[in-house]
Amino acid sequence: MKRKALSCAVMAVIAGTMVAPVLPAVAEEIEEVAVTGVRGKPRSVSDSPVPVDVFGSEALESVSYTDTNDVLKTLVPSYNVTRQPISDGGTFIRPAQLRGMPTDKTLVLVNSKRRHRAALVQIGGSGTQGPDIATIPSSALKSVEVLRDGAAAQYGSDAIAGVINFILKDNAEGGSFSVRT
């Protein structure tokens, strides 16, 4: 009986030392998540998690070219336009390329709405094509937004190379006339 009492006392002492100390409560850090959408409010370039270039009318007018393709080739490093050989109607259509990908992988928007593709489908022998950017006059542009990263999750498979959004001037009256020499 004495042994049982002694062993119970020893067990109580050991169990008392094995009690975990009470730790102060640690504040849980909450990770900030940015959610963006097509119909959300406009955001500035510095708030964007992806590479977005925004060119205002001053930047567009400062380039010495008047063709929209040439203006974008000057301002956007990953923008390219290739001329087709003189053999058929493909000579007259110059769709945009971003990041060296095919022309149908660059989404072109005008005032945030999809631009229709060119009617000629045989460009470069691939059977696919993108919109002809040369049909958008540079004098009608208010600004150009270029997303130089894949946006297929947001816009679909035609935005794998990136997205170009042309914002047109919203003048309801009047017009403009410019001469470059």
Where in this protein do the model-derived segments appear?
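Cleavable N-terminal targeting peptides that direct proteins into the secretory/outer-membrane pathway or into
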Residues: 1-29
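Envelope-exposed proteins and targeting segments
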Residues: 29-31, 48-53, 92-94, 102-106, ...
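N-terminal periplasmic "start-of-domain" segments of outer-membrane beta-barrel proteins
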Residues: 32-63, 69, 90, 119-125, ...
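Non-catalytic regulatory/gating segments with a bias toward low-complexity or hydrophobic composition
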Residues: 52, 60, 72, 144, ...
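N-terminal periplasmic accessory domains that precede
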Residues: 70-71, 75, 96, 132-134, ...
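Extracytoplasmic beta-strand/coil segments of soluble accessory domains associated
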Residues: 73-117
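Short acidic/polar hinge/loop motifs at secondary-structure boundaries
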Residues: 113-148
